[in-house]
């Protein structure tokens, strides 16, 4: 880009100038002061490219320019003040274009600005103090402006946005006031109905308040553990009114392992399994202060646990029980039990409805023999069901299939097993003869002499030629009970030649034993 040519982008001609900003601003200010700026469709007079964009120390050398540069340069036009040229003709000067009407001037001015991209933004950047007000803009008087401080909203760059916000706030206030006035009017018009509804509301409010007070009282009440339907009421445990003397005999029992609100759990440290205590046994500490009675014994016989219960929490805290403190028993006030029968009692954890004990008959087996018998019966039922399935006898609701044995071989007979090859062919099945065939054979014309035990074949019984008398003895070997042995194409051999002639060598009497 040539430095003496104007910048084609509006407002950026100062950036591509070789002169400093200070000198450029001075030059533009002098040119701007000599020209007259107007607000509406007026441009400064004597405005040219030479005195704006061309530096003073760098004159234009037309010899260095291209041939098309002079043709591309814009026509320099010096516009006179339009106010002085209202309707008269403007004379033409040397190398200057003059116009006779304001319309031609305006049209040429627009074309001039479009071609050379020169507008008032360059002048405004050079002279920030001078303002150029467009003709379409109308300023609002200062009296009509409302400051942001008075309204109470943050300041913005645009006055129009602030005015819109103010108008919206005023509309909201008026809408709320109208709704309040409308609601007050509705209340005044429906005063009679409101009085009736207030009375009904007051009654329901009282009931709700009572219910809330009751629920609050229940929540503030001390929580109690849950109970079943038929659970017995809490028992009042008495504390033994006994005072032990300093020389009273006591024996070590164990240590406290847990302290609850109204219970103390003691674990026995006695190695002897024969020493097990039952209820009503008095326990005490090493200083012979009474703890209370044993109320429950649980756990294994070798190392049982004992529970001492109290009626209130104050009684439990009064004995100063703590975990790990040794506990003793008084031999003269101990209630021992024999643990040997307890070894043969098999307990049950089963429970009935409402967590109650079930009947002994419904509990778990207490007799080993009865338990063994029940298990054997259960196994027998399973074995029977399995055999029914393996024998191709389908159970109700089950599929008919053949089970596999341990060797992964189906339960075929021994002569049908063919391991390592293709599975055996399907066996030929034939229904056995029934007694109903007897009546069928008697009523049949073709088979009137047929035995009722014969199969009813689709083809007639085969016929045979007569036999020679010499073969009568051998006919007995062929039983008539199995007609499948005879076929129509299989006929006995004819007798030898001359067998009927007594003089022939082949003649044999029927009485002769030719088999000898």
UniProtKB/Swiss-Prot annotation:
Q: Which InterPro entries match?
A: Gar1/Naf1_Cbf5-bd_sf, H/ACA_rnp_Gar1/Naf1, Naf1, Transl_B-barrel_sf
An annotated GO BP: ribosome biogenesis
Keywords carried by this UniProt record: Nucleus, Phosphoprotein, Ribonucleoprotein, Ribosome biogenesis, RNA-binding, rRNA processing
Q: Where is the composition biased (Polar residues)?
A: 413-422, 500-516
The answer on whether this UniProt entry bears the keyword Phosphoprotein reads: yes
Could you tell me where the Low complexity compositional bias lies?
Answer: 178-203
Q: Which GO molecular function annotations are given, in alphabetical order?
A: RNA binding; snoRNA binding
* UniProt-annotated stretches for the region Disordered: 174-233, 413-439, 489-516
Q: Where in the cell is it found?
A: Nucleus
Entries under Gene3D superfamilies matching the protein: Probable tRNA pseudouridine synthase domain (2.40.10.230)
Q: How does it assemble?
A: During assembly of the complex, component of the small nucleolar ribonucleoprotein particles containing H/ACA-type snoRNAs (H/ACA snoRNPs) which contains cbf5, naf1, nhp2 and nop10 proteins.
UniProt cross-references to PANTHER family, sorted A to Z: H/ACA RIBONUCLEOPROTEIN COMPLEX NON-CORE SUBUNIT NAF1, H_ACA RIBONUCLEOPROTEIN COMPLEX NON-CORE SUBUNIT NAF1
- Can you tell me which family this protein belongs to? Belongs to the NAF1 family.
What is the name of the protein in this document?
Answer: H/ACA ribonucleoprotein complex non-core subunit NAF1
Q: What is the lineage of its organism?
A: Eukaryota, Fungi, Dikarya, Ascomycota, Taphrinomycotina
Q: Which gene encodes it?
A: naf1
């Amino acid at each position: 880009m040539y430095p003496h040519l104007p910048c084609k982008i509006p407002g950026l001609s100062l950036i591509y100038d070789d002169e400093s900003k200070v000198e450029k601003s001075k030059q533009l200010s002098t040119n701007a002061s000599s020209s007259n700026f107007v607000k509406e469709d007026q441009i400064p007079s004597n405005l040219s490219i030479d005195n704006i964009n061309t530096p003073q120390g760098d004159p234009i050398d037309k010899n260095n320019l291209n041939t098309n540069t002079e043709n591309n340069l814009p026509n320099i036009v010096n516009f006179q003040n339009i106010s002085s040229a209202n309707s008269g003709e403007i004379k033409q000067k040397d190398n200057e274009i003059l116009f006779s009407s304001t319309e031609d001037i305006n049209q040429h001015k627009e074309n001039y600005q479009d071609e050379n991209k020169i507008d008032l933004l360059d002048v405004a950047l050079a002279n920030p103090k001078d303002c150029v007000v467009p003709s379409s803009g109308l300023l609002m008087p200062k009296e009509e402006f409302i400051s942001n401080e008075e309204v109470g909203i943050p300041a913005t760059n645009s006055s129009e946005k602030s005015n819109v916000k103010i108008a919206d706030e005023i509309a909201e206030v008026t809408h709320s006031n109208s709704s309040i006035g409308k609601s007050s009017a509705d209340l005044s018009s429906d005063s009679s109905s409101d009085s009736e509804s207030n009375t009904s509301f007051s009654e329901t409010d009282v009931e709700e308040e009572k219910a809330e007070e009751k629920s609050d009282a229940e929540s503030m009440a001390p929580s109690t553990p849950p109970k079943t339907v038929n659970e017995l009421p809490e028992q009042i445990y008495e504390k033994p009114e006994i005072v032990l003397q300093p020389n009273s005999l006591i024996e070590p029992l164990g240590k406290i392992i847990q302290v609850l609100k109204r219970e103390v759990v003691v674990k026995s440290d006695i190695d002897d399994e024969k020493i097990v205590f039952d209820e009503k046994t008095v326990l005490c500490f090493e200083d012979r202060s009474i703890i209370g009675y044993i109320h429950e014994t649980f756990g294994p016989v070798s190392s049982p646990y004992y529970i001492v219960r109290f009626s209130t929490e104050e009684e439990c805290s009064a004995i100063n029980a703590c975990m790990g403190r040794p506990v003793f028993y008084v031999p003269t006030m101990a209630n021992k039990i024999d643990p040997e029968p307890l070894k043969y009692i098999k307990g049950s954890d089963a429970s009935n409805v409402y967590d109650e004990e079930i009947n002994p008959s419904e509990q778990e087996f207490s007799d080993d023999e009865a338990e063994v018998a029940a298990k054997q019966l259960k196994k027998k039922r399973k074995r029977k069901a399995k055999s029914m399935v393996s024998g191709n006898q389908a159970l109700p609701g089950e599929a008919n299939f053949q089970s596999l044995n341990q060797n992964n071989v189906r339960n075929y007979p021994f002569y049908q097993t063919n391991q390592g090859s293709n599975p055996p062919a399907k066996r030929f099945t034939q229904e056995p003869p029934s007694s109903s065939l007897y009546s069928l054979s008697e009523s049949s014309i073709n088979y009137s002499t047929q035995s009722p035990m014969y199969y009813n074949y689709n083809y007639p019984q085969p016929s045979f030629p007569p036999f020679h008398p010499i073969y009568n003895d051998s006919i007995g070997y062929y039983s008539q009970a199995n007609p499948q042995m005879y076929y129509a194409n299989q006929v006995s051999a004819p007798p030898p030649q001359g067998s009927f002639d007594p003089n022939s060598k082949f003649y044999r009497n029927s009485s002769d034993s030719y088999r000898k």
